[in-house]
Regions:
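Surface-exposed acidic/polar loop and edge beta-strand patches at domain peripheries
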Residues: 1-120, 131-347
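Asparagine-centered strand-capping/turn motif at beta-strand->loop junctions
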Residues: 124-128
Length: 347
């Protein structure tokens, strides 16, 4: 069942069966990516493809994030593979729920709200037992690449194992204090540039600076001449995981046609290493970065996306400041624009 939400000229759709947001349009822009096989019958009927991959689109909430080697859930957990229950949906706001029986009947309530250029989400986690990883999973596609900007990070790291063996640009199992990752060929790659000219499947984790009160990622798309700003509460989501998917997956249903895709996966996890590893002492927890969320109490996870036209000449953000209902975006040149943003969302 598809639920439509509207505010002004903004339109979003929540797919209750897949748990994702396959449509978000605003001002003629479509910021989010939809997999090309999403409606192909042969993929939808394939029992070997996880539901989250069959209907891959937009943004969805992962709990647990990635591999669940504790409870045996499919990749990204029941929140991304099982139907949601609608609690209320009217106008610009929808509220939905999902229950996780294998985690002590933990309840996840999802709130989606459209306000102007923003798509706001809150996930309220209640009850349950044990520890769990989680992350948002918005995806954007770039026809001709783009430029990324980030809030201050104190580390960048890659997993010990590749997403798709032999197809990673970045060297494995590294930890750096800047945004320049070592590559397999001995060179370096600036994480602010999407590797559009490379057929790769890559993944890295960025760790938020300790004093950040607002975490953000900005994608400026070249061909599309727009920008997507993704905002998070860094206390709840201390890492941003970047998934680069650019034609390297040559097996069904991907078949080398998943190109130009960037996942901006803000959350609490140990990269792509699975729930069991995240629940143990690890290299992130050694940096005082939490990699799991303890169930059994109420947690509120706040996230937002803002879609804007790209101002002429802009190539990179140097700062994003939220104050009194206004987002101030500063470009590397010092130029600024002010964007209305709903007060109270990150309170």
């Amino acid at each position: 069942m598809l639920i439509d939400l509207k505010h002004g000229d903004a339109h979003a759709v929540f797919d209750m069966e897949a748990g994702n947001i396959p449509v978000w349009t605003i001002g003629g822009r479509s910021p989010l990516h939809v997999a090309p096989w999403r409606d192909e019958p042969e993929v939808q009927d394939d029992p070997n493809v996880a539901d989250v991959d069959k209907r891959l689109a937009g943004d969805f909430f992962c709990m647990p994030f990635g591999r669940d080697d504790v409870h045996g859930h499919p990749i990204h957990g029941p929140t991304a593979n099982a139907p949601w229950l609608m609690l209320n949906a009217e106008g610009s706001k929808g509220v939905f729920a999902n229950t996780l029986p294998k985690m002590g009947d933990a309840v996840v309530a999802k709130e989606i709200r459209l306000v102007g250029e923003s798509l706001l989400q809150r996930h309220i986690i209640d009850k349950g037992r044990g520890d769990v990883t989680f992350a948002h999973h918005p995806m954007v596609r770039m026809e001709e690449g783009g430029r990324l900007s980030f809030s201050r990070k104190r580390a960048a790291m890659t997993d010990p194992v590749a997403q798709h063996a032999g197809h990673n640009l970045w060297a494995l199992n590294q930890v750096r204090g800047d945004l320049n990752l070592d590559c397999e060929d001995g060179g370096q790659w600036d994480l602010r540039t999407y590797p559009a000219g490379h057929v790769v499947e890559d993944f890295c984790t960025l760790v938020e600076s300790r004093d950040n009160t607002l975490g953000w990622t900005c994608v400026m798309r070249n061909a599309e001449a727009d920008m997507l700003l993704v905002l998070k509460d860094p206390a709840m989501m201390p890492v941003t995981m970047l998934w680069i998917s650019n034609g390297a997956r040559d097996f069904p249903p991907w078949n080398s046609r998943h190109t130009g895709v960037l996942g901006i996966e803000d959350g609490r996890a140990l990269g792509g290493q699975g729930l069991a590893a995240a629940a143990r002492d690890n290299r992130l927890s050694a940096m005082d970065v939490p990699t799991v969320l303890p169930l059994g109490e109420v947690h509120v996870i706040r996230h937002a996306m803002v879609s804007l036209p790209r101002p002429p000449g802009w190539s990179e953000l140097s700062a994003v400041v939220l104050s009194r209902g206004t987002l101030t975006l500063r470009e590397a040149s010092g130029a600024e624009i002010a964007v209305p943003f709903p007060e109270g969302h990150f309170d």
